[in-house]
C-alpha cells in the first residue's frame, strides 16, 4: 500500500458556494451577476420608478463571461440576486499539446495542463503567436466550476 502515489488535484475547492447574495439595487455596471443560471458581466442596467402597487424594478442586461451570450432579467430592487465569485489569473504559456491542451505555468512555478485551447479567433491567434515563438501570458477566468482562457497578451516581463 505504501508504494501507491497519493493523487494530487490541482483545482480543488473548499466546497463553499460558488455565489453570494447581493441586493439588486446594490449591483453596478461592469459587476458580475448570475442571470438564467450563468455567470454574467453587467453591461446595461436601468431602474424603473416605483408603481402604485409595488417596488422599483431593475432591468439587467449581462454578457456570459464564458460564451459571450446575452442574458436579460427584470427584478424588484429589494430582491436578492446571486453574484458569482470570479477569479482571474495570469499564466505563462509554455506549450500546446497535439490534442489542443495548453501547458500553463503559474507565478509560483506550478504547471497545469487541464485547459483546452479556446475556440474561435482567440484560439487561432494564440496558436499562431505561440508557433511564431512569442512569449505569451494567458488570462484564465474561473467561476461556478468553469474555467477558460479569455485573453492572451505578449509577456513583456521577460524582455527586460
Swiss-Prot record:
Entries under PROSITE patterns matching the protein: IF5A_HYPUSINE
Keyword vocabulary terms for this entry: Cytoplasm, Elongation factor, Hypusine, Protein biosynthesis, RNA-binding
Listed GO MF terms: ribosome binding; RNA binding; translation elongation factor activity
Domain of life: Eukaryota
One Gene Ontology cellular component: cytoplasm
Keyword Lipoprotein: no
UniProt-listed GO biological process terms: positive regulation of translational elongation; positive regulation of translational termination
Modified residues (Hypusine): 52
Processing and modification events after translation: Lys-52 undergoes hypusination, a unique post-translational modification that consists in the addition of a butylamino group from spermidine to lysine side chain, leading to the formation of the unusual amino acid hypusine. eIF-5As are the only known proteins to undergo this modification, which is essential for their function.
Compartmental location: Cytoplasm
Gene3D superfamilies, alphabetized: 2.30.30.30, Nucleic acid-binding proteins
Keyword Manganese listed: no
Function: Translation factor that promotes translation elongation and termination, particularly upon ribosome stalling at specific amino acid sequence contexts. Binds between the exit (E) and peptidyl (P) site of the ribosome and promotes rescue of stalled ribosome: specifically required for efficient translation of polyproline-containing peptides as well as other motifs that stall the ribosome. Acts as a ribosome quality control (RQC) cofactor by joining the RQC complex to facilitate peptidyl transfer during CAT tailing step.
PANTHER family associated with the record: TRANSLATION INITIATION FACTOR 5A FAMILY MEMBER (PTHR11673)
Family: Belongs to the eIF-5A family.
Full protein name: Eukaryotic translation initiation factor 5A
Biological source species: Spodoptera frugiperda (Fall armyworm)
